[in-house]
Each structure stands twice: as structure tokens, then as C-alpha cells.
Amino acid sequence: MSDPRYQVDVSVVTRFLADQSQPEQNRFAFAYTITVQNNGSLPAKLLSRHWVITDGDGHVEEVRGAGVVGQQPLIAAGKSHTYSSGTVMTTRVGNMQGSYQMLAEDGKQFDAVIAPFRLAVPGALH
């Protein structure tokens, strides 16, 4: 059982960016809005991110970096942080998953898991 002091949940909403995509050049742009909800009992700072991006051909790219969109937000207990970002893929369908490395107010580091989510051009999946 996980410690309730360190409970961070992540939700994702995605959308295809047709105006920034060039299908004839295998360039498909997607935006995603992520909400990081601190359901633990301690404030926690989002230190870094780790993404695993898999395209429709099975090619995998890993991305690691500090914070999110240039920030390392401190999220109070019971509060959330929402941000938007994006990615470009060479296939019409793919998925992303990963984790955020968090630092609780008491000094404990822990991971907040980002469950796999799909990126897809509308109509690409039946």
C-alpha cells in the first residue's frame, strides 16, 4: 500500500493540432493538457519529468528534463497544477507515458506515475 502522504494523481486531455500538422510530410502535431493533483497530505514540488513516447511504428523516444514548461511548481496538499504542452510524431497514432519526480515537504522523493495515454489523428482508429 502506498503512503497517503505522497499521493499525486495525473490526468491528461489530448488533441490533434491539424493546423500545425503536415500529413504529406508525416508530421502530426498533438497538444496535451495535464493536471497534476496532489492528493497527499504534504506539499510536493515537481522536480523533473520522464516521458516515454512511442509512435505507431513502435519507435520509442525517451525525454527527461527539469520541471514542466520551465517551471518546478510546488503543489500544496489538496491542490493541483495544470499545464499544456505538445509533441510532434511521424505517425497518425502513438502513445505517451512516464513519471514526474516529486519532492515532498519532508524531504522524501517519490515518483508520480503518468499512465499511458493515446495520441491519435481523428478517424485514425476504428
UniProtKB/Swiss-Prot annotation:
<dbReference type="InterPro" id="IPR023065">
    <property type="entry name" value="Uncharacterised_ApaG"/>
</dbReference>
<dbReference type="InterPro" id="IPR036767">
    <property type="entry name" value="ApaG_sf"/>
</dbReference>
<dbReference type="GO" id="GO:0070987">
    <property type="term" value="P:error-free translesion synthesis"/>
</dbReference>
<feature type="domain" description="ApaG">
    <location>
        <begin position="2"/>
        <end position="126"/>
    </location>
</feature>
<dbReference type="Pfam" id="PF04379">
    <property type="entry name" value="DUF525"/>
</dbReference>
<dbReference type="InterPro" id="IPR007474">
    <property type="entry name" value="ApaG_domain"/>
</dbReference>
<protein>
    <recommendedName>
        <fullName>Protein ApaG</fullName>
    </recommendedName>
</protein>
